[in-house]
Amino acid sequence: MRLGVSLLGSTGSIGRQTLEVVAAHPDRFRVVALAARSQIDALQEQVRIFRPELVAIAQESLGISFPDTRVVSGPGGLVEAATYETADIVVIALSGNSGIEPTLAAAAAGKTIALANKESVVCAGPLLRDIQSRTGCQVRPVDSEHSALWQLLQLPHRPAEIARVILTASGGPFRDRPLEHLNQVTPDEALAHPTWRMGPKITIDSATLLNKGLELIEAHWLFDLPFERLDVVIHPQSIVHALLAFVDGTTVAHAAYPDMRLPIQYALFYPERVASTVPPLDLARIGPLEFFPPDTERFPALPLAREVGIAGSTYPTVLCAADEIAVEAFLAGQIRFTEIVPLIRSVLDRHQPASEPLTLEAILAADRWARSVARELVGRAIRHA
């Protein structure tokens, strides 16, 4: 039987690679819904090839581009695609906070979710966990590090036997650049990630290491891991993706070439493993593997994200929203690379968190507030430049 796949964020980097995996296994999967916010030409080509039953787009006026397919639009369209009746697996590959509501809707509908949207867990982790406990939905992480950790945690063990959980980070393109030169970094330089092929937002987050900080928060909620057991190491080769250290001194590692098709395929096929077009790992050809502690002076976003994760409430939402605005401003040449994290911290310092318990409405309100404040701070930076 072929499983129906609903793919949200189909024209982005993860979305395109998901369709590569699906296309390689036409006997196992069929695309029943596609959703995208932009790149309509690319979406039209995807619709022509995969012939989904439903297409969700940002603007209703663009529906004329798909005359032979049922079209829905706006945030409600994303939710409809995420809960589509014939979808067995919902792949959430949206970038940013737009992924939160459809992820929660898919979970409430009891769908199996292949999740590549960090914000759904970082901002709404408590809500997602609560819905999972009620519906029994399965969330399969697509991020390479969390996929690796998910696989490691399936090894026989008792929770008390875990001493440390370690996520790796490449260190991005500036891990060796002199600190005094970081304020001269250009957007093109920051977008040149040494190992991964990703979209622009996550590539900049990888350069600041905020991405890894968000992954610490994500690991906390996905796997119920306390922050004091979560660590990060710099691993420039991006071959080892996660490590599990046990109390007896043993450490097990997950290693693979840095290719997103591997975690995508694992999430789609789980618990089955099938042959991949990615070559098997050849450690002899790779040569030395290096590991270093992160330099928090170079990467202040990492301890900031940990601090935010521990604080909880709507602080993670403010972190993510302010980061989106700061990254947009950097890519537009409005602020320096070294101003990204200070701008985010300034927004966090102004935030008054929502009262408990956390709600979707509080998350969305905090998101709007943080974006407004971040834009105001960007405007001030431009005026004083």
From Swiss-Prot:
Any GO BP: isopentenyl diphosphate biosynthetic process, methylerythritol 4-phosphate pathway involved in terpenoid biosynthetic process
Keyword NADP: yes
Keyword Transmembrane helix carried by entry: no
Record's keyword terms, sorted: Isoprene biosynthesis, Manganese, Metal-binding, NADP, Oxidoreductase
Pfam family, one: DXP_reductoisom
InterPro entries: DXP_reductoisomerase, DXP_reductoisomerase_C, DXP_reductoisomerase_N, DXPR_C, DXPR_C_sf, NAD(P)-bd_dom_sf
Pathway: Isoprenoid biosynthesis; isopentenyl diphosphate biosynthesis via DXP pathway; isopentenyl diphosphate from 1-deoxy-D-xylulose 5-phosphate: step 1/6
Family annotation (SUPFAM superfamilies): 1-deoxy-D-xylulose-5-phosphate reductoisomerase, C-terminal domain, Glyceraldehyde-3-phosphate dehydrogenase-like, C-terminal domain, NAD(P)-binding Rossmann-fold domains
Catalyzed reaction equations: 2-C-methyl-D-erythritol 4-phosphate + NADP(+) = 1-deoxy-D-xylulose 5-phosphate + NADPH + H(+)
GO molecular function: 1-deoxy-D-xylulose-5-phosphate reductoisomerase activity; manganese ion binding; NADPH binding
Function field: Catalyzes the NADPH-dependent rearrangement and reduction of 1-deoxy-D-xylulose-5-phosphate (DXP) to 2-C-methyl-D-erythritol 4-phosphate (MEP).
Name of the protein: 1-deoxy-D-xylulose 5-phosphate reductoisomerase
Source organism (scientific name): Thermomicrobium roseum (strain ATCC 27502 / DSM 5159 / P-2)
